[in-house]
């Protein structure tokens, strides 16, 4: 990546610590609001509706009730252009342009504000793509489609950049995340399922070569006095495997099924759960969302509300003792939302469990006769997230290039507001980083 290497040589750069949980939703919303996930009321891609066991919803732009940087800039009369920042559907009304994100429903046409811009955007990109089906065995197709998607995104970015002299321009590109999920085991010899496949390794390398080229083409349009910053909301690492949270809860007597064990890969919602004998159940993903079956809250609750804290502590102790197939401790770390966040709004899980510093995914499906899986239970996946993302500030004002101090993702929003001379709302929890830009 020669262009990025050249930029790095005149940048301040370092690690950007993500949030709990280190997931795209809520991390980008935290970054640009300066407010933690609990206060925002967003804890991941899926949230359980109150009063149900399995009814779920995906957060949208309207879920975020706190203003983000572009909202405050818009109120101040600044012109903004935002591309793909999640959650971004439906596109919020801003003083400028907002193009929706990868969570946009298939077939949606209302993905850009103002709507009058859509025909031009479609023409420039030959159809604006939002994401690629990346958890699939056909890696060659995945690689080709990711390269094409990212090229179209950058074509849109060049088109939008050239429309007017924006005060603030932000572009989110989901492609690198997808490349990691689909191809990590082909370029990392330390991956537990490493495959020496030159063609697939080459696809990953081709993606990054293309990305470097596209970054260069976009920045060639940017005047030298414009501040350029690269940010990521989380890092990536090899996926070690999956821990079957519901299989474990069954083994401990906290979750009870009726009848014989279900076939492998059975979702919990399709299993015969005996809720009258169940104290807790879990959901899969980058971390385990654990819910308690509480009387008066769940339809068939078994735990008294006064028992919840003690039961959570018991589960935490039991999870801490879990060992991997190699005999080593799994490294389960349990977080209770009310102890982690300033506030707990929205529909939070009762417990959040990370496994092996999030190197192990949580599998919510059943029927394996084992607590561990080598592969993801919802489709092929080579990588998971990590807490350390990156920042890179090109040509920092103070001239201090090279490695910089570790920073916190939640501090980016107030730092940008300070840079623009805007007051920082009193409920913002992050702090401006000085110097940074």
Predicted regions mapped to residue ranges:
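A long, amphipathic alpha-helix that forms part
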Residues: 143-164, 168-169, 179, 185-230, ...
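Short, solvent-exposed loop/turn segments at secondary-structure junctions
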Residues: 21-22, 36-38, 80, 86-90, ...
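Low-complexity, glycine/alanine/valine/leucine- and proline-rich hydrophobic stretches
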Residues: 355-413
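Active-site-proximal alpha/beta segments of enzymes that process anionic O-linked groups
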Residues: 1-167, 174-181, 290, 431-436
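A structural signal for well-ordered alpha-helical segments within the folded catalytic domains
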Residues: 2, 26, 64-71, 151, ...
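Secreted, luminal/periplasmic, and some membrane-associated catalytic domains
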Residues: 1, 17, 45-76, 91-96, ...
């Amino acid at each position: 990546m020669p262009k990025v290497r050249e930029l790095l040589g005149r940048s301040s750069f370092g690690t950007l610590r993500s949030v709990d949980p280190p997931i795209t939703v809520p991390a980008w919303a935290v970054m640009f609001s300066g407010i933690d996930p609990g206060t925002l009321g967003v804890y991941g891609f899926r949230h359980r509706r109150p009063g149900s066991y399995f009814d779920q919803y995906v957060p949208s732009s309207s879920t975020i009730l706190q203003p983000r940087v572009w909202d405050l800039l818009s109120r101040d009369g600044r012109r903004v252009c935002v591309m793909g920042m999640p959650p971004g559907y439906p596109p919020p009304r801003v003083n400028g342009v907002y193009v929706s994100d990868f969570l946009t429903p298939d077939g949606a046409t209302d993905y850009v504000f103002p709507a009058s811009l859509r025909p031009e955007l479609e023409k420039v990109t030959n159809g604006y793509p939002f994401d690629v089906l990346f958890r699939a065995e056909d890696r060659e197709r995945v690689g080709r489609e990711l390269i094409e998607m990212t090229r179209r995104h950058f074509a849109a970015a060049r088109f939008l950049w050239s429309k007017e002299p924006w005060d603030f321009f932000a572009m989110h590109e989901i492609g690198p995340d997808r490349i990691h999920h689909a191809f990590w085991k082909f370029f990392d010899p330390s991956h537990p399922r490493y495959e020496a496949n030159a063609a697939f390794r080459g696809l990953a390398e081709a993606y990054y070569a293309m990305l470097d080229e596209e970054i260069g083409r976009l920045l060639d349009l940017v005047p030298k006095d414009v501040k350029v910053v690269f940010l990521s909301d989380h890092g990536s690492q090899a996926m070690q495997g999956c821990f079957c949270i519901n299989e474990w809860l069954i083994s401990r007597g906290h979750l009870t099924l009726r009848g014989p064990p279900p076939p492998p890969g059975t979702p919990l919602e399709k299993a015969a759960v005996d809720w009258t004998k169940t104290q807790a159940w879990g959901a899969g993903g980058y971390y385990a969302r654990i819910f308690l079956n509480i009387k008066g809250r769940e339809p068939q609750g078994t735990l008294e509300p006064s028992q919840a804290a003690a039961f959570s502590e018991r589960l935490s102790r039991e999870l801490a003792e879990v060992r991997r197939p190699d005999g080593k401790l799994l490294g389960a770390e349990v977080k209770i939302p009310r102890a982690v966040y300033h506030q707990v709004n929205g529909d939070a899980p009762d417990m959040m469990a990370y496994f092996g510093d999030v190197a192990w995914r949580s599998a919510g499906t059943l029927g394996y006769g084992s607590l561990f899986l080598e592969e993801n239970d919802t489709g092929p996946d080579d990588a998971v997230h990590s807490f350390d993302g990156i920042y890179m500030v090109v040509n920092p004002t103070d001239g201090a290039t090279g490695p910089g101090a570790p920073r916190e993702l939640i501090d980016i929003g107030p730092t940008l507001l300070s840079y623009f001379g805007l007051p920082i709302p009193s409920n913002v929890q992050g702090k401006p980083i000085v110097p940074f830009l």
